[in-house]
A protein has these predicted regions:
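Short acidic active-site motifs
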Residues: 117-120, 139-143, 163-166, 194-195
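Conserved phosphate/ATP/ADP-binding segment of small-molecule kinases
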Residues: 149-155, 159-206
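Substrate-binding N-lobe of the ribokinase-like
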Residues: 3, 23-90
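Positively charged, low-complexity intrinsically disordered leader regions
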Residues: 1-23
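Surface-exposed amphipathic alpha-helices with a cationic face
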Residues: 48, 141-151, 200
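Short gly/ser/thr-rich secondary-structure transition/capping motifs
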Residues: 75, 111-116, 155-161
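Conserved phosphate-binding/catalytic loop of the ribokinase/pfkB sugar-kinase fold
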Residues: 56, 81-83, 93-130
Length: 206
């Protein structure tokens, strides 16, 4: 059994500030950190650290080297990662002295997935393998249908949540990764037990 993560690859630019910048304000940053992230990258790295054989599929720009080197250091197989003529997705993160943050996301290459690229990746996987998805790339509905047709088990983290997710063929999902916020958005319930009960009612096969 192989694990395939099809997802976002981001560079996180983290600025340490006295306070979150206000409209029209210019302030100096005390520190800048750059890290590899994106839900796809993070999930692949976590699986690899847990000892799984995991493949990562995603799109990056010409500044790909740090991303690939870091993923490979975790033990992630990056053979399916491809370069595109755009900037790698990134996040600008402001963190104030109290730990509060503000985040601006740029999708970049994460929004350049095509049906041809999806096919080229899924052709290397088969029934019994596991696909892990999030909602930071485009074309998720197409990926769901094609993976399901191949007999691949599908795990979905519906984050960031959008109402359109509820129109996807979610009965094809084998397992949901959700937190309390996403669960509430999926079910319109607020209490954890009610969220779980409603998820089981809506998706009894997951």
């Amino acid at each position: 059994m192989s694990f395939l993560v099809m997802g976002s690859l981001n560079y996180d630019y983290i600025y340490s500030l006295d306070h979150i910048v206000a409209p029209g304000e210019t302030i100096a940053s005390a520190k800048l950190d750059k890290a590899c992230g994106g839900k796809g990258f993070n999930q692949a790295a976590a699986l690899a650290k847990a000892g799984a054989k995991v493949y990562l599929a995603g799109l990056v720009g010409a500044d790909k080297d740090q991303m690939l080197e870091t993923a490979q250091e975790f033990g992630v197989d990056c053979r399916f990662v491809q370069e595109r003529d755009n900037a790698t997705g990134h996040a600008i993160i402001q963190v104030d002295k109290n730990g509060q943050n503000s985040i601006v996301l740029f999708g970049g290459t994460n929004r350049m997935w095509t049906a041809e690229y999806v096919d080229s990746v899924l052709d290397s996987f088969e029934k019994g393998d596991v696909l892990i998805l999030q909602n930071e790339i485009n074309g998720i509905e197409d990926i769901l249908e094609k993976a399901y047709a191949r007999g691949i088990s599908i795990v979905l983290n519906p984050s960031p949540f959008e109402d359109c997710i509820l129109s996807w063929q979610l009965e094809k999902i084998s397992l949901f990764f959700i937190n309390e916020v996403e669960g509430s958005q999926m079910t319109q319930k607020s209490e954890p037990k009610d969220i779980l009960d409603q998820m089981l009612f809506q998706y009894p096969d997951a």
